[in-house]
């Protein structure tokens, strides 16, 4: 006796489906040279706000044997805000043809937040209990069955044991804003002028080897703030 089994699989292709809206302010201040010290001070930085949203409608695929594949609405994305300054001290000693540059980058404020919005900026998710647990849920706009038929989503589908599984569920903390406390990075650059033909530079980023991690208070995920300490050299020829 032969039996026929129908399974569903998904495939994907690259597509430009993300929109990005970015605005902010860049600034720069030059305080000139402190002549007795042969040192100048520059301050630069920026504030920006970035909003990214996926305009495609992703699929909520359970597995190959499940009866339905959900089609989720567009609008998933994230927000990012950042305000930073860089203080740069440049000391030029002409007598020995050396330039010392010390940079301190300070991130005063940084935050990230996951969003799922409609075209008017309203959140698509809502709180719903499932198996005695609370989740933030996004309803599909429709679903496909194993015969390839598409059906628009109905509120009554949320009470169906199988169809309710293609609703997009996340832990309530997912959409909470994560704010990072201020932090600073110290870097150094030494440049030696070799006559009129070349300059040799030695670079040290995070040479204090500062290690600091940020823990998201909602998800408890950890992110490394400081890059690893590294040293480099650069040779510049003047032709």
Where are these regions (language model features)?
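Extracytoplasmic loops and strand-loop junctions of Gram-negative outer membrane beta-barrel proteins
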Residues: 7-14, 66-73, 168-174, 182-184, ...
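Outer-membrane beta-barrel proteins, especially TonB-dependent receptors
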Residues: 1-16, 24-28, 144, 170, ...
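Gram-negative outer-membrane beta-barrel transporters
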Residues: 7-121
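Outer-membrane beta-barrel architecture
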Residues: 26-30, 86-90, 189-191, 203, ...
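C-terminal beta-signal and adjacent terminal beta-strands/loops
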Residues: 108-171, 181, 191-239
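Short acidic-hydrophobic sequence patches enriched in Asp/Glu that either
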Residues: 81, 188, 227
């Amino acid at each position: 006796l032969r039996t026929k089994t129908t399974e569903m699989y998904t495939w994907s292709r690259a597509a430009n489906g993300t929109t990005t809206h970015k605005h902010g302010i860049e600034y720069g201040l030059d305080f000139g040279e402190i002549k007795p010290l042969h040192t100048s001070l520059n301050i630069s930085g920026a504030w920006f706000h970035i909003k990214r949203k996926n305009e495609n409608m992703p699929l909520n695929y359970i597995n190959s044997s499940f009866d339905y594949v959900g089609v989720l609405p567009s609008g998933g994305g994230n927000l990012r805000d950042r305000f930073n300054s860089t203080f740069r001290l440049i000391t030029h000693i002409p007598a020995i043809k050396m330039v010392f540059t010390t940079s301190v980058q300070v991130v005063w404020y940084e935050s990230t937040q996951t969003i799922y919005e409609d075209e008017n900026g309203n959140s698509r998710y809502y709180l719903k209990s499932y198996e005695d647990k609370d989740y933030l849920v996004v309803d599909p706009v429709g679903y496909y069955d194993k015969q390839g038929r598409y059906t628009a989503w109905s509120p009554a589908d949320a009470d169906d044991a199988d169809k309710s599984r293609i609703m997009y569920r996340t832990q309530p903390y997912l959409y909470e804003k994560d704010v990072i406390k201020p932090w600073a990075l110290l870097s150094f650059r030494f440049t030696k002028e070799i006559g009129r033909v070349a300059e040799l530079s030695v670079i040290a980023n995070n040479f204090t080897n500062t290690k600091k991690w940020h823990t998201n208070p909602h998800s408890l995920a950890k992110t490394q703030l400081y890059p690893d300490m590294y040293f480099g050299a650069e040779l510049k020829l003047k032709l």
